[in-house]
């Protein structure tokens, strides 16, 4: 895919940071030596880690140069680098691996979680949050529009698959865990109409669908996409629409 846009991503910074705050609140580590933000984005989640553990060595990495550039401006004292979770290996001092909305992009993410856990010392924590929204109308609509005659040839079969069942995560990780906490949360974000929903997903889920298209085709796709999802997001009494957004959380403390 093309590079991520930090500017587009940060249009809904507070809403995107809330799951990171909720994940952070459940990490059972008081005084970590080293904390790593996997897929740190523009640094909004890293900032939360610095605030909770000001004495720790906090760092972050991301595959996107644009995201890393923005993160360095936001937190100039934090070490940010371009990197990929698939090749990352934590060192012996790492007490917390934190990841907000990254692992869902990896088809083998359970394998990667097990690999990272195997490299952590006992008592260290892997904390992960992933969107679990492939069945939501935002994402069903993406695929439906991509299948239409106007776009099928260029877009093809895009988007990631649904996440595995919770039991699959539990069975895969329990053998390495002294403590394993898994839960779902469904957020209902009040947004300023369907246009705002489109702006939200343009930064993330829509990217694989838009990247193969030229500028005019992108405009046509977005018009068709908006028309496809609009009936599923009725307007509330105050003019808002509610974006339903399920997410799964995992906090694994190494045995």
Swiss-Prot record:
Its main location: cytoplasm. Its EC number is 2.1.1.144. It comes from Brucella anthropi (strain ATCC 49188 / DSM 6882 / CCUG 24695 / JCM 21032 / LMG 3331 / NBRC 15819 / NCTC 12168 / Alc 37). Disulfide bonds: none annotated. The lineage of its organism: Bacteria, Pseudomonadati, Pseudomonadota, Alphaproteobacteria, Hyphomicrobiales. SUPFAM superfamilies: S-adenosyl-L-methionine-dependent methyltransferases (SSF53335). This is Trans-aconitate 2-methyltransferase. InterPro entries: SAM-dependent_MTases_sf (IPR029063), Trans-aconitate_MeTrfase (IPR023506), Trans_acon_MeTrfase_C (IPR023149). Keywords: Cytoplasm, Methyltransferase, S-adenosyl-L-methionine, Transferase. Belongs to the methyltransferase superfamily. Tam family. One of its GO terms (molecular function) is trans-aconitate 2-methyltransferase activity. It is found in: Cytoplasm. It comes from the Bacteria. It catalyses: trans-aconitate + S-adenosyl-L-methionine = (E)-3-(methoxycarbonyl)pent-2-enedioate + S-adenosyl-L-homocysteine. GO terms for cellular component: cytoplasm. GO terms for biological process: methylation. Catalyzes the S-adenosylmethionine monomethyl esterification of trans-aconitate.
